[in-house]
């Protein structure tokens, strides 16, 4: 009977590894995730309005802000709700993609 919990734990661990590998192997995933940000932060993260541009910002800064929005440490009108919809891995991908874009 002890083998069932061990097998279940191993299966969950393996699925997590497959999920992480699948995310890491898709070079366009960061871009796809970032597309949802374009309405407010502009195409490629270059805002045309009063909303902060994200293009060229340091990855660590974007990650920190997203985590602060997600935890509620940073107040916002919308971002605190949106950030909760992303996993930590997705936030890393988003931040990396925006950091690689050219600021204008």
Language model features: what each stretch is:
Residues 56:
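Conserved strand-loop elements at the edges of beta-sheets that form or border functional pockets
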Residues 67-89:
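Short Fe-S-cluster ligation motifs
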Residues 1-8:
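Bacterial N-terminal signal peptides that target proteins for export
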Residues 35-43, 94:
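The canonical Cys-X-X-Cys-His
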Residues 46-47:
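Short, non-ligating residues that shape and space the ligands of small metal-coordination modules
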Residues 43, 72, 101-104:
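Generic structural signal for alpha-helix termini and adjacent loop/cap motifs
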Residues 14-34, 50-52, 63, 68, ...:
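Electrostatic cytochrome c docking/interface patches
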Residues 84-104:
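C-terminal capping alpha-helices of c-type cytochrome domains
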């Amino acid at each position: 009977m002890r083998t069932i919990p061990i097998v279940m734990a191993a299966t969950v661990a393996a699925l997590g590894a497959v999920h992480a590998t699948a995310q890491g192997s898709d070079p366009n995933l960061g871009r796809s995730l970032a597309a949802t940000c374009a309405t407010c932060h502009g195409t490629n993260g270059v805002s045309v309005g009063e909303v902060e541009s994200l293009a060229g910002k340091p990855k660590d800064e974007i990650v920190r802000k997203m985590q602060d929005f997600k935890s509620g440490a940073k107040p916002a009108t919308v971002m605190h709700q949106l950030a909760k919809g992303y996993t930590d891995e997705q936030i890393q991908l988003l931040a990396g993609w925006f950091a690689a874009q050219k600021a204008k």
